[in-house]
Amino acid sequence: MSGRVVSVLRYLLAFALVGVVGWGLQPLRLHLQQKERNAGLLLPAPEFDKTDALAQQLAWFSLGGLRTFAAEMLCVDATNAWLLQDWPRAHRRWSQITTLCPRRVNYWIRAARDMAKNAVAWVGNDETLSTHEKAVRSNDYLDAAEAFLQEGIANNPGNALLWLELAAFDEDLARRTNFTRAVENYRKAVELGASPMYRRWEFYNLCRIRGREQEAWQLGRELYREERHRAPSLRCLLLVLQNKLNIPEESRFTPEQLFGTRERARKQLRAFLHNDLRFPTTGIRELLHDE
């Protein structure tokens, strides 16, 4: 028997096996689709670029009810795109992955981080790009990251992890910031079951917003009542806020109340004064000078 005939027979056998497996999985596929319909989770068939060979091949699996399998295969290629620093391809893959499995919160988070951190960092280090080109491309990837998170929340509005991720995106000082939205997102995440510790991050972002000092002061005093919230930054910010708001002497905290001793207060306040977290520092220099 010639080698060509053997090769043809092997292909025929492979197709036959695929057909048998597909036929065997048909009852399970129909059952799962019915469950998805009953739960209101059945999604439309994803659209793929006709020039994208891998996505086209995996489209058959997704149409057969194997969306998770297809998404995992695309995750492998997204990782390969990361290794090759091929960020347009990585963005395309994550868009396809999140379309296939919009209820998988981890996919949305990974997609956003890949764009906001990895892609933006690569653009910043690319010496072939001009300053203007770097700014434009970085902004495009940040837009993509934000879009992934917002679409993830739209598909999973009750998931606290996505709200936390968007809050962290909004407060990242290395990129563009939106402290007002970060406050709301941390608040929403806690309402949805995230750790109450994130109320402190709500407070930190409130302190960065001009005109909301009174709100920050009230929240800070409330948090200070609990030992677990008494971080050095919170103690320092309480001193700053009472200076900015001209809080009456009888309602103020003293450095000894907040830090235990004057020496500890000086140490913490010096460190706070020289941090780069864009917190207000009203009155700190004067207090240290008086010491």
What do these predicted regions represent?
Residues 214-291:
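Terminal, low-structured helical/coil segments at or just beyond the last alpha-helical repeat
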Residues 27-159, 164-191, 200-204, 208, ...:
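Short coil/linker segments at helix-helix boundaries
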